[in-house]
Amino acid sequence: MKIIIAGAGAVGTHLAKLLSREHQECTLMDADPSRLEGLDTDYDIMTMLGSPTSIKALQEAGTDEADLFVAVTPDESRNMNACILAHAIGAKKTVARIDNYEYLDTKLKPFFRKLGIDSLIYPEVLAAQDIINGLKMSWVRQRWDVHGGALVMLGVKLRETCEILNQPLKELCGPD
């Protein structure tokens, strides 16, 4: 999967590192060269110096072939504009980090999709969800929501003596 991340701050860099470990083709773009220093040598990612609202920079990054474009700079307007441009250039899916809670209203989803923004990330809501999930399931080490929460995958730690270790799920859950 070809992924372009605009914004090499804490969120963008962390995301790029995670995707690098999953062997995704990842390009991290930022207008500040100091934020990109060493990342391409320490991790399996490409770095690119450029503004996410520059059409030329987006084209050079290969946005027209991107499966996913994620804009996570600290500037909400820049993120939204970058996604609109990336969509127009040909990115298949776009995600913008936002600061305005109002934008998360489900009635606005079609509006943002028309603009070319497929998903919105609001960091405070994500953090709150993680805290709530942690309180509900303190025994869970990792949690992944797949397909918008339709499927939830959990990572748990088991003792070596646990009876379910090395058992196929089919046997644990039964035939249905």
Regions found by a protein language model. Give the residues of each.
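Cytosolic regulatory regions of ion transport systems
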Residues: M1-D176
